[in-house]
Structure formats: structure tokens, C-alpha cells
């Protein structure tokens, strides 16, 4: 609904209304300026001063400040995607570890994590704890696979069953403050169960290329999510999946997810995803940690905006009061 006007590197992108857009009557704003501001404190300060009308995805730690500021409001929505740790199961020599070779070790690692505590410490309780590719708000969420409570003794028992007392493992993660804090909390939690974790921070683009190349043992990454459940699963966990970086392969999972692609009845599809989810919850090529909440902060003069779970900003029917 908008057309490009100008781009000033590291400063702004300016768009203006495209009059020939098919739905142009619903676009009430003539001009939009997007400003990249990496620092969350600076973003909030600009909103408070009136320099900005809206901030996309404020820090969870700033929610209280916004709530206490006259003239500002919040909109929050749980995203479609997930936060997770990918386990290298078959992608080269770095898969040849207890973590990569034995699902019991991965199960022990998962059981040693208190997902709700992780949410409270890192996200001030604004995220959702999770253990599936779908958030609890999704129709595809399997109610029969609730988030497991942390159980250090059960984790130790699984390690012993796998013939392990302590397991050394490296987790690579993006070098941003929130993810770093998250992994430090996980590192401390799983240590109590017998995991000696080394953290390796890297640029996100490098992290993705390392995943593809198999140069990882565990890798912490996010997925933004898709409205259709296929987009959160098939490409990640089928044998020939395009971004199946762990190189996990289970023919039964392939069968179920391929069949789900061909079924149109939602209830029948959900039954297939539920069945695949049970297997994935045992094999754990992906250790799901939770689901981010998209938090938008707005000046009260912005009216008609609605936060949506894909995190996209849509300006149909949005107005700016004088």
C-alpha cells in the first residue's frame, strides 16, 4: 500500500501512500518513516519524547515504564514462531557426541531446563514457556504434550542410563544481550544435572552458516513462524528438509508430515501433527524453549493499530489523531 521515497543508510526509510493500491481507501496515513534504532533504551526515549509514534518490539524490561507513562500504550501478542536449541544429530563429525548420538542425553538436557523460570528471568514473564513448534495460543498446539516441569533427578537418571555422568557440550548462539543471558541461564540450570556447557557467541549470519555446515553441537536459534503449521515443522525435521541443519531423519515423521500436507480437514491434519509431535518430543532434534511475545509501544494518538502474531506491521485503518 506504500511506495518507496528515499533511504538514508543507518537512518531512515521513507514511504508514501500508493494511490493505485487495490485497497488504498483503507490507508489513512500519507507518509511513513521507518527508523532503525538498535538500542532499546534509545527507542523508548524517542517514543517518550514524541520523536516516534510507535516502537516495534520493545524490550520486556521496558513494559513497566510504558505502562506508567501517560500518553503511551502497549499491544502484546504471542508470536507464531519459537525459540529453540538445535542438536546436531547427523551433520558431520560434530554430531559424534553423546548429545548427538543418544536421545536420552537430549531428553536429560531438556528436563534440566526450567522453561517458566527462563521466561521470568530473561523476559520478565512476557514470553510463553514452550516445548513444541506451536505456541499454546495456536490451534495446532498439542494439549497432551504440556511443558515438562524441571526434574534434575530424572535428568541425572537418564544420563546414567545412557552411560554418562557428566557431558561436555558447546552451544553456539547469537551475540545479542537477550540470547546471551538466556543461554547463561540454561548453562547454569543444566550444570546441576551433569552438563558442562561452553558458550560460543557469534554473529547471527555466521551462526546460520555454521549450522548449515554442521560446525556445531548445539545451536540456539529462533524461527519467526508461519500461519500454516507446515512452515514450523516440515523443512526443519524431514529427512530432506531444506533447513534441517541437525540432519535428523525419521521416516515415520516424514510420512506423517507429508500426509499432513495433503490433508485439508483441520482436525485430521492436527491428529497427524500431534502424532509427529510425540515422536519429535522423544527424539528431540529440536529442544524448544518457548515463544516470544511481540510487544509494541504506541503513542495514544495512533489509533486502529492491531498487533498480529506474525509480528508484521499492517497500517490498514490506522490513523493519527491530531
Regions found by a protein language model. Give the residues of each.
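Extracytoplasmic/periplasmic ligand-capture domains
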Residues: 1-122, 138-283, 320-322
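Mature extracytoplasmic/periplasmic domains
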Residues: 124-144, 295-297
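Short aromatic-enriched loop/helix-cap "lid" or pocket-rim segments at secondary-structure transitions
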Residues: 133-134, 231-234, 300-303
Amino acid at each position: 500500500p506504500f511506495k518507496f521515497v528515499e533511504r538514508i543508510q543507518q537512518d531512515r526509510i521513507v514511504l508514501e501512500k500508493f494511490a493505485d493500491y487495490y485497497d488504498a481507501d483503507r490507508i489513512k496515513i500519507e507518509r511513513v518513516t521507518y527508523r532503525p534504532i538498535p538500542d532499546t533504551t534509545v527507542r523508548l526515549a524517542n517514543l517518550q519524547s514524541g520523536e516516534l509514534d510507535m516502537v516495534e518490539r520493545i524490550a520486556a524490561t521496558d513494559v513497566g515504564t510504558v505502562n506508567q507513562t501517560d500518553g503511551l500504550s502497549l499491544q502484546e501478542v504471542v508470536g507464531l514462531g519459537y525459540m529453540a536449541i538445535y542438536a546436531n544429530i547427523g551433520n558431520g563429525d560434530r554430531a559424534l557426541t553423546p548429545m548427538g548420538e543418544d536421545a536420552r542425553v537430549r531428553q536429560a538436557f531438556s528436563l534440566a531446563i526450567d522453561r517458566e523460570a527462563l521466561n521470568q528471568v530473561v523476559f520478565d514473564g512476557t514470553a510463553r514457556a514452550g516445548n513444541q513448534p506451536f505456541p499454546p495460543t495456536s490451534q495446532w498446539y498439542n494439549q497432551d504434550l504440556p511443558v515438562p516441569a524441571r526434574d534434575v533427578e530424572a535428568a541425572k537418571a537418564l544420563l546414567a542410563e545412557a552411560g554418562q555422568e557428566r557431558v561436555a557440550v558447546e552451544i553456539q548462539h547469537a551475540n545479542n544481550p537477550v540470547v546471551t543471558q538466556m543461554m547463561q541461564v540454561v548453562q547454569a540450570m543444566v550444570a546441576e544435572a551433569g552438563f558442562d556447557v561452553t558458550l560460543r557467541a557469534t554473529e547471527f549470519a555466521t551462526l546460520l552458516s555454521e549450522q548449515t555446515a554442521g560446525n556445531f553441537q548445539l545451536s540456539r536459534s529462533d524461527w519467526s513462524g508461519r500461519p500454516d503449521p507446515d512452515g514450523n515443522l516440515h523443512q526443519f525435521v524431514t529427512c530432506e528438509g531444506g533447513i534441517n541443519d541437525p540432519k535428523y531423519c525419521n521416516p515415520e515423521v516424514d510420512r506423517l508430515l507429508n500426509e499432513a500436507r495433503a490433508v485439508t480437514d483441520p482436525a485430521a491434519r492436527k491428529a497427524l501433527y500431534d502424532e509427529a509431535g510425540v515422536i519429535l518430543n522423544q527424539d528431540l532434534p529440536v529442544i524448544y524453549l518457548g515463544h516470544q511475545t511481540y510487544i509494541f509501544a504506541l503513542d495514544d494518538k495512533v489509533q486502529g493499530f492491531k498487533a498480529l502474531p506474525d509480528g508484521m506491521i499492517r497500517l490498514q485503518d490506522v490513523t493519527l489523531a491530531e
